[in-house]
């Protein structure tokens, strides 16, 4: 967590053949696939992209919602989340693409503090 630059680096692990909740990236981000395949799905569940281990991608905010998950094995991905401000990083969406919740730099910073205190 970099308070000055408003950057959060975090490892995510997605289970094999599972999809996380529908969401939209609303801030810049970079990803690096450490293990497995990072799979990107359309809101309807169709496979759009497969990123194998070793894949680096710089991403921009995107109005297109999607789901993500692992391939034949669990996937571990380094996400470098770069909102550069206190605006939302993610919007969590329902099936109608309505915003259920958001995640901000402050939310991730608080989660990090709680983890360090445990």
Predicted regions and their residues:
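Short acidic-glycine-tyrosine-enriched beta hairpin
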Residues: 43-64
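Glycine- and acidic-residue-biased ligand/ion/polar-headgroup-sensing regions
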Residues: 16, 25-44
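Short Gly/Pro-enriched loop/turn and capping motifs at secondary-structure junctions
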Residues: 38-39, 64-66, 83-86
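Conserved hydrophobic/aromatic beta-strand scaffold that supports enzyme active sites
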Residues: 9-11, 30, 48, 56-58, ...
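Double-stranded beta-helix
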Residues: 69-118
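Short acidic (Asp/Glu) patches
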Residues: 14-17, 35, 60-65
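A short glycine-rich, His/Asp/Glu-containing loop-to-beta-strand
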Residues: 1-17
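Short histidine-centered beta-strand/loop micro-motifs
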Residues: 10-12, 20-25, 42, 48-49, ...
């Amino acid at each position: 967590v970099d308070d000055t630059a408003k950057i959060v680096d975090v490892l995510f692990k997605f289970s094999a053949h599972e999809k996380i909740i529908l969401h939209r990236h609303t801030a810049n981000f970079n990803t690096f696939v450490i293990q497995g395949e990072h799979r990107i799905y359309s809101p309807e569940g169709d496979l759009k992209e497969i990123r194998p281990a070793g894949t680096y991608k710089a991403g921009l905010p995107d109005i297109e919602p999607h789901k993500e998950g692992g391939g034949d094995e669990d996937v571990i991905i380094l996400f470098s989340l770069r909102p550069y401000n206190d605006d939302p990083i993610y919007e969590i969406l329902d099936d109608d693409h309505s915003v259920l919740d958001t995640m901000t730099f402050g939310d991730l910073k608080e989660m990090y503090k709680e983890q360090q205190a445990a």
